[in-house]
Amino acid sequence: MRDAVIVSAVRTAVGKAPKGTLRTTRPDEMGAAVIKEALARVPGLENTEIEDVIMGCAMPEAEQGMNVARAAAIRAGLPVETSAMTINRFCSSGLQSIAMAADRIKTGAAEVIVAGGLETMSMIPMGGHIIRPNPYLVEHYPDFYLNMGLATENVARKFEVSRADQDEFALRSHTRAAAALDAGKFKDETVPLHVVLEDMDENGKKQRREVVFDKDEGVRRDTSAEGLAKLKPAFHLKGTITAGNASQMSDGAAAAVVMSDSRARALGVKPMARFIAYATAGCPPEEMGIGPVFAIPKVLQLAGLTLNDIDVIELNEAFAAQSLAVIKTLGLDPDKVNVNGGAIALGHPLGCTGAKLTASILRELERRNGRYGMVTMCVGGGMGAAGIVERI
């Protein structure tokens, strides 16, 4: 079986939903921007070579419905002969799309695929506009639809994750993210977007202005342990999860160009990484956040690696409680996990996140001269996902 390599990976800066800079930017336009830039970074690659576009989206309806991947591909200037599909595994959708592209390339079913993810939580709320649950599950297994915050409260209790530890983790996320932004660590992976905003001027008149959006806007530099400690529980009166130690609602998009190693050699392009393995696993929906505990051992086995082999880990911070439970249960090295902050500070644009984290981990492996990186996350409905890349 041949190798599938990532030769380009980019993302937008992450907007803070629902009132941030990307609040009026359509998801297909964000997707088009990252697809176009990802392709532009591969010298010699013609648009006609792209056989398929796979984009993940957690809430594929309304502005991000109607096979939004196809709309994004056409808006990016790809020919009508290039097919496209939108896939959904909730929070792992962006990583799932890259894994699916890699699988098709490894088996010889394709040579070049663009894969990524997109999400606008400003336009499409968590759960979508109209939630219509399965009646049988509502009656016989209501926890299947348990609010993710309450599911994470279950995880916090079961794995004995304290409020103080959650707040400390959240503070570290903001501190690390601010330092990474100041050091320009995200600059190479970020595609600047020209955004037109409508707001009021100082006289109360509506005005239109264009801004260049190129920096994640969720980081709160004034975050403190004292401030976090004052926040009230968000999901349960006696709970420990607050708005400060949970991920943010966000907008964003990311895309990667995945191709066979032979095609990369023919183009004279140096791959960023080889996509090694991907695994998913199920867990009780009422303990949704613990999913990576089951997915990580599976992907390590598939890759023939151990945790000691992994140089950098991007563990999506859906909630501090579930992140800490995963770290504690598997014995992950905190110094390898989310070294530049995570979703608590940088945001979590659902279906985009897996592709976004892939773009980030590739740069961090390069900076550290590392070999293996792992992207992992919990998934709504009671699942976990994990993927491993090898820097070349």
Where in the sequence are the language-model features?
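Condensing-enzyme catalytic core mediating Claisen C-C bond formation in acyl metabolism
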Residues: 1-27, 224-290, 294, 359-360, ...
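N-terminal extracellular/periplasmic Venus flytrap/periplasmic-binding protein-like
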Residues: 11-13, 24, 28-33, 44, ...
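Conserved beta-ketoacyl condensing-enzyme motif
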Residues: 22-112, 117-135, 190-213, 286-287, ...
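Conserved catalytic cysteine-centered active-site region
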Residues: 25, 57-111, 142-153, 222-248, ...
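Short, well-ordered amphipathic alpha-helical segments that serve as non-catalytic structural scaffolds
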Residues: 27-43, 68-72, 97, 148-155, ...
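Active-site-proximal alpha-helical scaffold in enzymes
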Residues: 87-118, 156-186, 255-262, 327, ...
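Condensing-enzyme catalytic core of the thiolase-fold
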Residues: 179, 255-267, 271-277, 294-301, ...
